Regions:
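Active-site rim beta-loop-alpha module in soluble metabolic enzymes
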Residues: 56-131
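N-terminal glycine-rich "phosphate-gripper" loop used for MgATP/nucleotide binding
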Residues: 6-22, 121-129
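Short, charged, surface-exposed secondary-structure boundary motifs
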Residues: 42-48, 64-65, 92-93, 159-163
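Short, acidic/small-residue loops that bind anionic groups at enzyme active sites
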Residues: 24-48, 137-157
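C-terminal functional extensions of proteins
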Residues: 151-170
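Short glycine-/acidic-enriched loop or helix-start segments at secondary-structure transitions
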Residues: 21-23, 64, 131-133, 161
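Metallocofactor- and cofactor-centric catalytic cores in central/energy metabolism, strongly enriched
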Residues: 1-2, 6-7, 116
């Protein structure tokens, strides 16, 4: 890669979607690991459990996320437990009424646990730091075992860093 891409070990596109920037970057920099946080989160989650589910923001995101997961998995899979929309906006996650946001995230996590999710993915970069709320929701659903909670931003940084450290391209 030339220009700014020549100075980086990899790229994480921090938008929780099947983002079109990823294939573009892979085309111009084929020796550079490039992921979006949806892909990174799903890949991490698959290593942690058998029924991966996503908690996201608005209901309008669900069809796109479902399609993105199918693309990552190569089709429909019983390992994908689906996506639950919280109805919260991206900005609202961080600046909205804290009690409402917390209760909504806990409720969605409880619903996911009842639906059999054994790994829960935070389906928005704005959900970073909400792992504890998700764990509370899982407990409120009566689950006695902990459920891994995957933050796609963290997963992306670690995935790209790990790939870069392996020097697969020599």
């Amino acid at each position: 890669a030339d220009g700014p891409l020549a100075q980086v070990a990899g790229v994480v596109v921090c938008c929780f979607s099947d983002h079109p920037l990823v294939p573009m970057l892979r085309h111009v920099a084929p020796a550079l690991p490039v992921v979006h946080i949806l892909e990174a989160a799903v890949l991490h989650a698959l290593a942690l459990g058998n029924r991966v589910g996503i908690l996201t923001t608005g209901a309008a995101m669900v069809p796109d996320l479902d399609a993105g997961v199918r693309r990552i998995l190569g089709g429909a899979s019983p390992r994908y437990a689906g996506c639950i929309a919280t109805g919260l906006g991206v900005v609202e996650l961080q600046t909205g009424d804290r009690a409402k946001v917390d209760a909504t995230v806990r409720h969605a996590a409880a619903q996911g646990a009842r639906q059999g999710m054994d790994v829960i993915v935070l389906g928005c970069a704005g959900m970073t730091g909400m792992e504890g709320l998700v764990q509370q929701g899982v407990r409120e659903a009566g689950r006695t075992t902990r459920v891994p909670v995957v933050d796609g931003s963290k997963a992306g940084v670690h995935l790209v860093g790990g790939i870069a450290a392996c020097h697969y391209w020599g």
